[in-house]
């Protein structure tokens, strides 16, 4: 796993004398696929066991990729909203707040990348910068596969893309980055959706000059790579330290010539600002002189805009991000780089994120978008990015007042647990384990039928005819309740006497590793007041057993 980009190297270095600059790149560029556009940084680096990827592991979901993500083994600062993904992988987290299982996606599935690029098109993200870390090791094959998915999805949805090399911990970068471009990545420039600027294919190299052990390269090594790429006829972007111009703090000295030989500069900002006042301070003291220096040299300037670290409560329901858009547009920046599209590892993602704790694993500690008390739709930061892009392009008047509403309707979600605390019935019970214990919200109390006789059933009166959409069934989360399969059918009735089977008898696996929880989807259009579960088998104990029964609708 790569070194995090988050780290802010706060110890200031003495200001060095700027190295001699190379020939300026020429006049600032006209609009193209990065100038005048919103570019989103796309990691595309998640995988899951069972996705048929070369890694066959939980890439970037877990610290230990061999084990599923769990409360004690994960690499996340934020949780994804999984609603739109067609393929989902169960984790070892407990159920979500709404009772559904906690699942994640894999970028090795084309459908995942297709969902992401569909969002980009729908919400006005013009261009995606696909991050490409050292491709020569064990991660190379899956990165190659994801790159092919990105091209296919970009072409399907009309979104531009380019390769963005990240040289973090790539010690043999100087020769290998050239070989990778020549032998593999250059072929992608034949795509009609490969980004071009000034008639040249776009490439970014991120990480030259950073003052940390993960990027130990000399100015000479970096200048060689810059000159080589420019010799290949590309438009070259430099992902550079925040303080590139003065070569202090997060920048090594003697890199001034390297920085000033790129066609475009995109200084990193994650970990540097966390509120509106920080954004204003950087606008005055860093971004404004940066822009002036780039204008003087004919270099395009692409500052970062970030939604804010959700885990650190930086977002201020969009005000933090909008202030950055306002500051960068009034500055006259040539383009904007969103950091990042899908960075759930650092909680800086604009991709869909749960609105409330209903979409977060219970007890995980992850925050939802309503963490400051303001409801925000799961797509809010995608919509905010779209509006920021319109302001950049002059389609929306420059304004310091955020025009994007956190929600598109004032009506909150109405889905609720229809069975909570409702009257229950049963075919039988053992000792004091009555059916009422299945709807009492206590995960450790449970109903158990008479032993040794099947079928058995448990029913609940919803109080009125309703439209239940799904059921969430649980056994106690204690590991002592070992894995078992219960065969269950679902029956429904309007009057409590004539029941119809709406879901046939099916074996459902209850496993402590996944919270001992099962979700049953109900037929669309179902209308009922009384619902019943009919148990006809249990591999773990000769009885029907149920600790929590939620009926959502």
Regions found by a protein language model. Give the residues of each.
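Predominantly extracellular/luminal regions of secreted and cell-surface proteins
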Residues: 414-440
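Flexible, active-site-proximal loop/turn residues at the rims of small-molecule/cofactor binding pockets
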Residues: 14, 134, 271, 342, ...
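Aromatic, loop-rich ligand-recognition surfaces of beta-strand-rich domains
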Residues: 433-436, 440-501, 514-553
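Solvent-exposed serine/threonine-rich low-complexity stretches and specific carbohydrate-binding patches
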Residues: 502-510
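N-terminal secretory signal peptides and thylakoid transit peptides that target proteins
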Residues: 1-15
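Glycan-processing catalytic domains of CAZymes
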Residues: 28-413
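Sec-dependent signal peptide cleavage junction
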Residues: 23-27
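Hydrophobic h-region of N-terminal signal peptides that target proteins for export
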Residues: 16-21
């Amino acid at each position: 796993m790569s070194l995090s980009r988050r780290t802010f190297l706060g110890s200031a270095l003495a200001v060095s004398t700027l190295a001699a600059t190379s020939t300026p790149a020429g006049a600032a560029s006209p609009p193209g696929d990065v100038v005048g556009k919103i570019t989103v940084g796309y990691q595309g680096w998640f995988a899951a066991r069972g996705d048929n990827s070369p890694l066959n592991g939980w890439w970037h979901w877990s610290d230990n990729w061999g084990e599923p993500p769990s409360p004690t083994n994960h690499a996340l600062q934020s949780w994804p909203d999984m609603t739109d993904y067609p393929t989902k992988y169960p984790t070892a987290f407990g159920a979500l707040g709404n009772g559904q299982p906690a699942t994640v996606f894999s970028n090795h599935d084309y459908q995942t990348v297709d969902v992401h690029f569909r969002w980009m098109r729908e919400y006005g993200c013009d261009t995606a910068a696909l991050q490409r870390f050292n491709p020569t090791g064990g991660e190379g094959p899956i990165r190659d596969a994801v790159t092919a998915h990105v091209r296919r999805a970009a072409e399907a949805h009309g979104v531009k893309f380019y390769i963005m090399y990240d040289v973090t911990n790539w010690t043999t970068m100087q020769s290998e980055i050239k070989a990778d471009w020549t032998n593999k990545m250059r072929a992608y420039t034949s795509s009609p959706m490969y980004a071009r600027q000034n008639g040249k294919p776009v490439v970014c190299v991120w990480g030259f000059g950073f003052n940390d052990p993960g990027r130990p390269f000399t100015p000479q090594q970096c200048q060689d790579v810059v000159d080589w790429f420019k010799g290949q006829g590309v438009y070259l972007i430099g992902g550079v330290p925040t303080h590139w111009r003065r070569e202090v703090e997060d920048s090594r000295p003697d890199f001034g010539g390297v920085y000033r030989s790129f066609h475009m500069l995109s200084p990193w900002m994650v970990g540097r600002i966390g509120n509106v006042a920080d954004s204003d301070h950087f606008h005055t003291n860093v971004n404004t002189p940066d822009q002036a220096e780039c204008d003087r040299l004919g270099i395009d300037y692409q500052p970062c805009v970030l939604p804010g670290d959700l885990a650190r409560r930086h977002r201020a329901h969009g005000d933090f991000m909008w202030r950055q858009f306002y500051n960068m547009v009034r500055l006259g920046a040539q383009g904007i780089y969103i950091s990042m599209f899908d960075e759930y590892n650092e909680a800086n993602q604009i991709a869909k994120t749960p609105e409330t704790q209903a979409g977060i694993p219970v007890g995980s500690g992850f925050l939802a978008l309503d963490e400051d008390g303001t409801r925000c739709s799961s797509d809010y930061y995608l919509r905010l990015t779209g509006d920021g892009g319109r302001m950049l392009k002059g389609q929306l008047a420059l304004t310091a007042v955020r025009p994007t509403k956190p929600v598109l309707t004032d009506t909150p979600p109405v889905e609720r647990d229809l069975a909570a605390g409702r009257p229950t019935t049963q075919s039988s019970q053992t000792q004091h384990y009555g059916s009422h214990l299945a709807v009492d919200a206590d995960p450790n109390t449970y109903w158990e039928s008479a032993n040794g006789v099947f079928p058995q059933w448990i029913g609940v009166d919803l109080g009125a005819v309703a439209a239940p959409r799904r059921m969430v069934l649980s056994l106690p989360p204690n590991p002592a309740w070992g894995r078992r399969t219960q065969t269950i059918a679902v029956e429904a009735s309007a009057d409590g006497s004539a029941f119809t089977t709406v879901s046939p008898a099916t074996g459902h696996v209850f496993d402590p590793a996944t919270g001992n929880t099962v979700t049953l989807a109900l037929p669309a259009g179902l209308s009922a007041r009384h619902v019943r579960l009919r148990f006809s088998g249990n591999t773990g104990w000769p009885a029907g057993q149920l600790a929590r029964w939620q009926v959502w609708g």
